[in-house]
Amino acid sequence: MLPDNAIGHKVEELLLSHKVDTSAIAWGGKRLGIYFVDKGNNYRTSNIIYDREHSSISEASINDFDWDKVFDNASYFYVSGVTPALTQSAADLTLYAVKEAKKRNIKVSCDINHRKKLWKYGKKIEEVMPEIVKYSDIVFANEYDAIKILGVDSDINVDSDISDEDYKSIMDKLIEKYSLETVITTRRETIDSNHNNISALLYNNKNLYKSKKYNITNIVDRIGTGDSFAAGILSGLNMFKDYQYILEFATAAFCIKHTIPGDWNLTTKEEVISLMESSEKLDVKR
């Protein structure tokens, strides 16, 4: 949902400029939720300041949306833990939406995406997200999310690095508990604010797929990298059949976003594939 004012319509124009279908946008509310980034450097971490109270989506209701239009020709429906963190009504809206998607046999993809600063209306994430995950097919979650938020029973210590076998043990329980199809996890080793090592895991049908690792120095912007990874997975599922290839595609998109300022991954399918199939950093295109 976007506010029916100049700012809301400017957002629609921006979406249209990138060939995003905006026909199902609901218009209402008075303001667009925003956030500010106090960008860190070296050993100083970045800090996010949210300004999302009374935003259109935080006050939206089920009846604000034309659900037939929302789900028309959809193959996947994506939600994250950011929306239900805003208000009780936003949490109710998210739950209704995933139930509606399942009724229509549309696969639901859910990113736990825990943002502690947003959960201020009286509910904790572990009280809300499990019910949403019940209606999901694909979940973006790590072992900490599985145990601490989604209630997987395990004695494995997830406060430090774990083995592949321990990871599979936890994810087997998560998949069984919620009847999931696939669980996907990003890995990030932070050397400092400008230097990270990243990779990803995909677990499906008891098969663990591991991406190659990218050593990223001189990071331009970390904001939006997780969303870029999720977008890479979903677009990959629509384009490719092989899970290893899909994971490598998404991880390359994840990597590229670290080089682009702002919240948008302004890259192309061709650039992503070029990186994922290269063993070296890319040279200047001439």
Regions found by a protein language model. Give the residues of each.
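Hydrophobic beta-strand scaffold residues
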Residues: 22, 108-109, 140
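A short helix->loop->beta-strand "cap" motif at the edges of active sites that frequently abuts
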Residues: 101-107, 178-181
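Conserved phosphate/ATP/ADP-binding segment of small-molecule kinases
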Residues: 118-205
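Active-site beta-loop-alpha junctions enriched in small/polar residues
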Residues: 53, 82, 113-117, 144, ...
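Short acidic-glycine loop/turn motifs at beta-strand connectors
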Residues: 41-42, 203-207
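Catalytic-core regions built around general acid/base machinery
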Residues: 92-105, 127-135
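Conserved post-catalytic alpha-helical subdomain immediately downstream of the catalytic base
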Residues: 209-279
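Conserved N-terminal subdomain of the carbohydrate kinase-like
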Residues: 1-81, 272-286
